[in-house]
Structures are given as C-alpha cells and as structure tokens.
UniProtKB/Swiss-Prot annotation:
GO cellular component, as recorded: cytoplasm
Protein name: Ferrochelatase
Pfam families assigned to the protein according to its UniProt record, in alphabetical order: Ferrochelatase
Keyword terms: Cytoplasm, Heme biosynthesis, Iron, Lyase, Metal-binding, Porphyrin biosynthesis
Keyword Metal-binding carried by entry: yes
Keyword ATP-binding: no
Membership in a protein family: Belongs to the ferrochelatase family.
The organism of origin for this protein: Rhizobium leguminosarum bv. trifolii (strain WSM2304)
Highest taxon above the source species: Bacteria
Subcellular location(s) per record: Cytoplasm
GO MF annotation, one: metal ion binding
Classification via HAMAP family: Ferrochelatase
Length: 344
C-alpha cells in the first residue's frame, strides 16, 4: 500500500514509503584477482568474528603477519581459473545479480515489491543496499541470506550486518530474516532433478555420489550450531528421493581452513580414498551452495577431479549448482513469497 501524501503540509520533508524490499545476500567476492583486491576481500572476511571465533589477540598476529601477506596471491590465482572474463567478475557475482533480476521478473505481479542483491563481504554491501531500498520507499525488507542450511558463520553474520546498518538509521525499515530451508520439498526436488538431468548426459554411471557441503570447525558444532544436522538431513532426503543407498551416497565436508578439526568426513580425503580403494567413477554435488563459486568450480570441479584421477579414479563429474536456472529460481521464489505473506 502506497502512503497517501495529500494531507502532508507543504514543508514536509520528501519521503517515500509503502514499498516492500527483498534483499538477496550471498557470501561475497573480490572485485578482482589482483593482490590488492584479494587482500581487501580476505581481510574483511577473515576479521569477521562469526567466521574466525578465536580471540583477536591470538588470531590477528597470524592474520596480519602471515595470512594476508601470503594468501592473496594464492587465492587470486585460483580465482583466475574460474573468473568470468566476459564480465570481468566472479561467477558468484554474476549469478547473484541474475537471481535478483529474475526474482524481480517473477514477482512483477506484486507492484509494491522491490528486489535487490548484496554481498556480506565486498560489494555491493548490505548496508548500501538497505539504504537504497529505504530511499526507494521500502519501509519493510525481507532479508534473504542465500544459504539453505543455517550456520552462524554464514546466515547469522548476514543478519548481524543488516542489523548493524539499522543501528545508524533514524527511520528503520521493519526487517524480516528468512530462515533456512534445508528440508524444503521444492529444494530437495530441485536438487534431485539437477542430479538426474546431469547424469543423463553422461555415457557412464557413477558408483558413488558425494554431497559435499562447506565445512565448519567441529567446535562450532559442539557449541550448538545446527549446520551439521541440517546438512545431514538434506543429504538423507536427497538420497531417499534419488533412490540411492548409503553404499553409493555420502555426505562430506570441504574447504577446511587452519589447524582445527572440522566437520568430517573431509571431501578431499574421501575422494582420494575412494580412488585408492578401487572406485573408478564418482559424481559430486554441492547442495549447500546456491550458486557456483570458487569452492565448487575450482575446489571440486578442478582440484577434487585432479586428485581423483591422480589416485586411480577414471571418471569424475561435478554437478553444477542450481544457480539462476529455472528449478533454482522456483525454490528461491517459493521461499520469498512465503516470507512476504502479511506484508503484501
């Protein structure tokens, strides 16, 4: 409902209201693959206390003394391998922008809804897009962290950043945070359909399907983070929908960082062992990633595939994320329409 401005006094400040914003938020991306861009991005990411929960007195000497001097070049080279050279940006940025534009198209029947997108780290920032939506007249905003499974290091830090922006605003928009959807029927069906469609293009059948999720330190799980349990449930529902058994389907965890123990089994170690044990054909899907990014395109499609072949494997397939495809957008639209109820 658009506000009635007819009764305002002539000297009333110009304001817009009556709109509802939808803000899609993903992890983030560097602006380029060069050292400076990578260091700036990694600094913001690795100083987030939700991501690295160590005391700054312990972590910062390591971060600023070692990590930020060595890791930008290494990670920059990895990004170069999967960089969208046509648009000169990461594919995560490309897909997230596309998802926002497609969502706006899908919701065009809702005249008061405005759709935008942001990144937790890097640009466009959450704060800048909340401000932009407010300037467009959005006095209510649905904040959608694009993570099917909840984790403090992903979903919670998006929410933190949004509420941090609200602290600085005189006229705060009402904010509705979107919960996880790890066991949503439409989501599971979209994953299963993606697996079936991709495997149908192969001239071989995998002996094992791995569902590889981003890992978190084991200590986070022990402190009450529900992420591990939600990943396991997503995996179980996907396995049951595909009609697979525990003998040919596994949930694994990737992307560990630092000396701590992380959720297991580790994807890289599992891929090596499967090949060494005589498994010749495997496929990997990343159900926890809404869009393909460094962790899927380089870590799985490149590194894991290479490791599998180096250790005796013969056939390796990486199943793309749902990205901005029709099935993936159906999932996101269902969640958004559900969360808009009562506001439109």
């Amino acid at each position: 409902m658009t506000a009635d401005t007819s009764l305002r006094p002539a000297d009333h400040p110009a304001v817009k209201s009556g709109k509802v914003g939808v803000l899609l938020v993903n992890l983030g991306t560097p602006d380029g693959t060069d050292y400076t861009s990578m260091r700036r991005y990694l600094r913001e990411f690795l100083t987030d206390r939700r991501v690295i929960e160590w005391s700054p007195w312990k972590w910062y000497p390591i971060l600023f003394g070692v990590v930020l001097n060595t890791r930008p070049r290494k990670v920059g080279k990895a990004y170069e391998l999967i960089w969208n050279k046509e648009k000169n940006e990461s594919y995560l940025r490309t897909y997230t922008r596309n998802q926002s534009e497609l969502m706006a198209e899908h919701l065009k029947d809702l005249a008061t809804v405005k759709v935008d997108w942001a990144m937790r780290y890097g640009t466009p920032s959450i704060a800048s897009r909340i401000e932009a939506l407010k300037q467009e007249g959005c006095d209510r905003i649905v904040l959608f962290p694009l993570y099917p499974q909840y984790a403090a290091a992903t979903t919670a830090t998006v929410n933190d950043k949004a509420f941090q922006k609200l602290l600085s605003m005189r006229w705060q928009p009402a904010l509705r945070t979107v919960p996880d959807y790890h066991d949503d029927e439409t989501y599971i069906e979209a994953l299963a359909t993606s697996v079936e469609k991709h495997l149908a293009t192969l001239d071989w059948k995998p002996e094992m399907l791995l569902a590889s999720f981003h890992g978190i330190p084991m200590s986070y799980f022990k402190q009450g983070d529900p992420y591990y349990c939600q990943c396991q449930k997503t995996g179980r529902l996907l396995r049951e929908r595909l009609g697979l058994t525990k003998e040919n389907f596994m949930v694994t965890f990737q992307s560990r960082f630092g000396p701590e123990e992380w959720l297991q089994p580790y994807t890289d170690k599992t891929v090596e062992k499967l090949a060494q044990d005589g498994v010749k054909r495997i496929a990997v899907i990343n159900p926890g990633f809404v869009s393909d990014c460094l962790e899927t395109l380089e870590e799985i499609a490149e590194q894991a595939a290479h490791s599998f072949h180096e250790n005796g494997g013969e056939k390796f397939a990486h199943i793309p994320c749902l990205n901005d495809g029709e099935d993936g957008m159906t999932v996101l639209e269902k969640v958004v329409r559900r969360e808009l109820q009562g506001w439109i």
